[in-house]
Amino acid sequence: MGKGFSFASVILSYFLVGGGMFTATLVGSELQIGTELAAYALFAAGAFAGGFVAARASRGQTILEPAIGAVAVVATIVGLAATTPIGKLIWVVAQDQTIAFVGSVGLTGVVGALVGASVSERLLGEATQSSIPWIVYTAMAAFGASLLSTLFASILFLGDNAATRSGLDIGAVVLIGMGGGCLIAGLAVGASSRVRPLLAAFLGGGLGVTGFFTLVTRATPPATSDAVTGVALLAGAGAMVTLIGTVFGGVTVGRKQAT
């Protein structure tokens, strides 16, 4: 077991489990999996992967934080759906089916994250003292945080009449989501890590942003041939923002928890 409950690890687990579940959904879409059972299995697999990694990154109770993170992810999905016109329409037209779907997704997410965290703890024990694995942890956290932050930013700036009020286009919203996601992910990494994974945070942040923008460009293919250069520049910017967040999180929270 770890050294007590860690709220920073809950935030990190939230991004890791969320990133795992959304990645599993994208994989299912690419594979054109149409059965309901297979979709739930993918949700569980994504939550398992997120919970497994979250347990390795947690400095606290290990199993508790990924479970709370999974619940928060499900709450986010419900909240985002409830704020969109299509989500409100689905709720009115098929309330019973919606409740059943949300319950099933919530159950598979929480169980998957719990099983992943339990397996991780039993096989590998407490959180690692090495900074090398934090490249993977930070990459997954930056990816998940960028994705979730962009969803929030889309609702805030593009939902309903917000687009005319904010004057922002989808590109600006994606950049806001990426920047905010990398900063929050870095803060969570710095606060949760038992080491000072500065280089790992820089590399992981860049990898996470690369994965995020690869996803974005697949959804909306760029019109120019400079996409690779653009993604590289954005990955470098994301890496720097993640590093800044990691330094600040380590100084303000991580160092206090270590003493």
Annotated model-derived regions:
Residues M1-T259:
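Juxtamembrane/disordered regions of integral membrane proteins
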